[in-house]
Every structure is written in structure tokens, then in C-alpha cells.
Amino acid sequence: MAGDKFALVTGAGRGIGRAAALALGKAGWRVALIGRSAEPLAATAREIEALGQRALALTCDVGDPVAVNAAFAALEREFGRLDLLFNNAGAGAPAIPFEELTFAQWKAVVDVNLTGAFLCAQGAVALMKRQNPRGGRIINNGSISAHAPRPLSAPYTATKHAITGLTKSIALDGRAFDIACGQIDIGNALTDMGFKMTQGVPQADGRIAVEPTIDVAEVGEAIVHMASLPLSSNILSMTLMATKMPFVGRG
């Protein structure tokens, strides 16, 4: 059991974020939740509280530095410290030809996937440095696309490759302050975003094919495992994917 450990999960109203928040609550963590939509966050908070754990719902656009600063101030007032950040909030762009992407579509993905991860990590690092005892852990949600792209996915793929660089930089810079940072790269979790895998998605050879998926609860369990290690140990990179999905040899 985590005991008096405090976690923050972004994008916690749905999908992977919700699954991670619930898994952490079951493991004894007190969990703060960030997301843009109040009602899904409140629903996740109620489920965590039903487990006997404390939950704090904070409506916030992770791409807005003012909103992120306010969310971290509220978290510090309520919890007093932060032991884990799961940087999960993410967005994608339409699967259209590269030259047809608008700047607005590009920027919307960068704002959430990269800028949002940066801002939340920055807030977490600052708090982890000054709290007593100091230190904590950051887990960034990368993706299979941090290694190999899907067709017609340049904004998403670019941001997820960038997350790998962000993860390694935080892991290096955080060492002296007992801050560990790792990344989980997930392939085909069955969420609202991942449901399209069951209907058929473009492949590198031009085909449309159904792909295997994994239960999103398994991702939550993986986050709990990464979070349960002592700060002297770090899973820098974990890949969790459907065994039979096309990744190795994706093309």
C-alpha cells in the first residue's frame, strides 16, 4: 500500500488517465485529477473516494501556463506535497495528408501533448524540490508512436518523439534532487481514442486493418508498478502493447 503518498494524473476523466487514477486509488494513493471537462473528472473522483481514498478534481487546460500554475497551487494547498505525476493528457489530429494539416491542427496537438507535459512536469519538479522529504517520480505517457509512426500522424508522432527527449532530460536533471522520471509507451489500449483499432486503421502498406487491443486496466496496473519502486530505482522506459499488434516490422 502507498500509505500517505500523493499522486497527480492528467487527462484523468477518461481512458488511460482514469484507469491509472483508479489503479492508484486501489493501491492506496491519494489522487489529484486534472482534465478539461469537469463532469468526467468528478465521476473519477467519486470512484476513488468510494475506494476509501482522497481525491481532488482540478479542471484545467494543461496547455495554459496560468491554469497549470493555479492547479499546482491548489494541489499544494490541499495535499501539501506530490510524490507522483502521471503526465497522461493527450490529443491527436485528423488522419489527413501531411500537406493538408493546418497550423491550428498542429498547434492543438503540440499544446496538449508537449507543452502540457512540459508545464505539468515543471510544476511537479518545483514542488518535489522544495518539499520535505524532497523528491518524487514523474511518469510521462509516450506511445508506440514515440518509436514508429502510424500513417498520417505527423503531429502526434512528432510530439511523442519529443516526450522521449523530455523524459530523458528530466531524468538527468532530477537525479541530484531525488526525482526519478520514466516513460510508458502504450500500444492499442482500448479507450475511446483507441476504439478505432477495432474498426480498422490505416497500415503502412495502404491496407485498412483491425488491430488487437489491450484492456486499459492493464495500463493502470503498469503505472502502479512503476510508481511503487523506491526512488533509488527507475523504469526509464516501458513498452506495453497488445502482443499481436503490428509494431515490430510495422514498416
Question: Which residues are covered by each model-predicted region?
Answer:
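The beta1-alpha1 cofactor-binding region of Rossmann-like NAD(H)/NADP(H)-dependent oxidoreductases
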Residues: E39, T59-A71, F103
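Substrate-binding pocket helix/loop in short-chain dehydrogenase/reductase
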Residues: I96-F98, Q105-K107
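Residue(s) in the substrate-gating loop at a strand-loop-helix junction
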Residues: S143
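Conserved glycine-rich cofactor-binding loop
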Residues: G13-G15
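C-terminal helical subdomain
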Residues: Q183-I184, Q203-V248
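Active-site helix of classical SDR
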Residues: A121, T159
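Conserved glycine-rich Rossmann-like NAD(P)H-binding loop of the short-chain dehydrogenase/reductase
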Residues: W29-A43
